[in-house]
């Protein structure tokens, strides 16, 4: 199981490598996540959001050793482990023998179970935290337990200095009391307790069985632990040691990087296919009128104030986009779960671009009325005007292109098990129940991406931002992705320098990571829009195609509804 913004396939690096070493690997989407059903509020946490159901199912299979079952989860997937261990501890026969957390704290103190222990129909918060005194304890008994932690994890492995009240640096996690208690099976650390050592196995006999604890402190951040070869090697080493598996494969013997290269080529190829498919169809009689021939890059005329207006507008737009984006964060749009909008991250990604694009349109109109028009710019010469019938045919063409692209991708996935993904981003088949949620945010994505395409192509296909076509579009693509890149970069810079992720406030540690998630799509979509515009002089076609593809990619990778 994984965190709230991912499908199970993002963790396939671990899955593939474990399977190569002889493990039977079960991967699933948590309830309300990925392709799993949305449950009602009384069923959310039943059986660890699906993890304990999976464990019990695995124990019924003849090819699974019932005495060698382990669970592993990344980020919020670790929460499911917390809940599942709570249930397994209460079971007549415990099924789980080993636990590996990735980018998630273990349970250190007995009162921490209150935050996740409410399982409707099974336990109450009071029962879950019956030892509600905040003392360190051994939650895992004689199971083998490990943690893969990133030195710069944005969310986990945080501890407050009891003397100063300040956050302790994340890279010093092995010096924290939480880590020292965990490695020593729940003791209450004091000044004599040695700091932890990364990769060292701490052993102890518990209830007559020798168990171990281990923490792998890796370079990297919260989600990078899913892609780093060193973290994968640690995960292999843990499971092999936990169950004394005889394998000739070393922990560093991995093949996933080749799969990642192939899936990245496929993901980029999907956008390329959409561009060339659109260009080909635009020449067909059915869609005649959606293309007006090749666009010619205009030479920006030099008038007094030209550069000042151009760069001034750019700076104003960037500043507004930065402020409006942070405003959305501080008002919890990215975590919003309501009765109408049920995907906060999708709502945020669409709103962020739509709001800044509308503001850009207003600034551009002011620029046109106050400067460009007075200096001879003719609105009829920049491909902005169109007809209702042309818009209709453009919409039909965009739907045909995106529909064909998705069918091609899904067909390749179904017949050849091809993966179209790149790190965080990917596209895969989805359940029909997601279509309604997609349609809710589609208008927001359309506003953002269509206006962005108009700005990039109609207004700026000239030498103002670069003397040739390649430089021009690269500059504009970088500008489009600049706000999330700068905000994320500022947060990361503070984090890397101090070890504390608090630039935007202790309650908003997610900002550097979440902002980074939007950079790739905001950079690549101007390239696809320009590729289509340069051969059709139709700014709306690329904008609509980008909006639909970006919306699908965002929605299929986000939770629908999920508890805390």
What are these regions (language model features)?
Residues 311-564:
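Alpha-helical transmembrane segments of integral membrane proteins
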Residues 268-315:
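Juxtamembrane interface at the cytosolic side of transmembrane helices
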Residues 147-149:
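Short beta-strand/loop motif that positions the catalytic acidic residue
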Residues 15, 19-35:
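Conserved alpha/beta-hydrolase
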Residues 41-62:
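Alpha/beta-hydrolase active-site loop
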Residues 78-91, 99:
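Short glycine-enriched nucleophile-adjacent loop
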Residues 63-75:
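Alpha/beta-hydrolase fold nucleophile elbow
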Residues 1-6, 10:
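Single conserved hydrophobic/aromatic residue that forms the stacking wall/gate
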């Amino acid at each position: 199981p994984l965190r709230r913004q991912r499908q199970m396939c993002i963790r396939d690096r671990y899955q593939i490598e474990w399977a190569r070493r002889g493990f039977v690997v079960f991967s699933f989407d948590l309830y309300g996540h990925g392709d799993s059903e949305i449950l009602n509020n009384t069923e959310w946490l039943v059986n660890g959001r699906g993890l304990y159901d999976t464990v019990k199912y695995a124990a019924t299979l003849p090819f699974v050793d019932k005495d060698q079952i382990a669970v592993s989860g990344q980020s919020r997937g670790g929460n499911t482990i917390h809940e599942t261990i709570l249930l397994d501890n209460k079971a007549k026969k415990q099924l789980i023998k080993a636990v590996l957390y990735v980018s998630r704290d273990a349970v250190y103190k007995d009162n921490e179970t209150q935050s996740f222990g409410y399982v409707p129909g099974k336990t109450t918060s009071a029962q879950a935290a019956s030892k509600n005194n905040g003392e360190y304890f051994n939650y895992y008994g004689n199971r083998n337990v490990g943690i893969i932690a990133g030195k710069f994890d944005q969310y986990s492995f945080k501890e407050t200095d009891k003397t100063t009240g300040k956050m302790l640096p994340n890279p010093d996690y092995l010096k924290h009391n939480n880590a020292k208690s965990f490695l020593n099976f729940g003791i209450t650390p004091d000044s004599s307790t040695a700091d932890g050592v990364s990769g060292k196995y701490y052993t102890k006999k518990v209830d007559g069985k020798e168990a171990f604890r281990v923490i792998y402190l890796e370079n990297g951040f919260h989600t990078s632990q899913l892609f780093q070869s060193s973290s994968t090697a640690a995960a292999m080493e843990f499971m092999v040691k936990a169950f004394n598996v005889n394998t000739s494969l070393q922990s560093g013997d991995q093949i996933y990087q080749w799969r990642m290269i192939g899936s990245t080529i496929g993901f980029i190829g999907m956008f390329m296919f959409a561009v060339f498919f659109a260009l080909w169809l635009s020449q067909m009689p059915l869609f005649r009128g959606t293309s007006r021939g090749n666009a010619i890059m205009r030479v920006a005329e030099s008038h007094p104030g030209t550069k000042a207006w151009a760069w001034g507008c750019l700076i104003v737009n960037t500043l507004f986009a930065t402020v409006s984006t942070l405003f959305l964060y501080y008002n919890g749009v990215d975590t919003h779960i309501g009765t109408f909008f049920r995907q906060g991250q999708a709502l945020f990604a669409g709103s962020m671009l739509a709001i800044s694009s509308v503001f850009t349109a207003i600034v551009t109109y002011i620029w046109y009325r106050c400067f460009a028009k007075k200096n001879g710019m003719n609105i009829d010469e920049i491909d902005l005007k169109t007809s209702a019938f042309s818009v209709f045919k453009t919409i039909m063409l965009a739907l045909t292109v995106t529909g064909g692209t998705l069918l091609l991708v899904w067909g390749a996935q179904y017949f050849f098990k091809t993966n179209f993904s790149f790190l965080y981003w990917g596209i895969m088949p989805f359940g029909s129940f997601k279509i309604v949620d997609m349609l809710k945010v589609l208008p927001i994505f359309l506003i953002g991406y269509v206006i962005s395409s108009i700005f990039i192509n109609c207004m700026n296909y000239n030498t103002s931002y670069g003397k040739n076509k390649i430089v021009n579009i690269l500059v504009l693509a970088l500008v489009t992705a600049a706000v999330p890149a700068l905000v994320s970069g500022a947060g990361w810079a503070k984090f890397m320098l101090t070890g504390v992720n608090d630039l935007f406030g202790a309650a908003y540690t997610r900002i550097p990571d979440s902002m980074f998630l939007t950079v790739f799509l905001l950079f690549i979509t101007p390239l696809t829009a320009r590729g289509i515009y340069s051969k059709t002089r139709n700014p709306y076609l690329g904008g609509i195609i980008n909006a639909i593809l970006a919306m699908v990619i965002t929605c299929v990778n986000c939770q629908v509804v999920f508890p805390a």
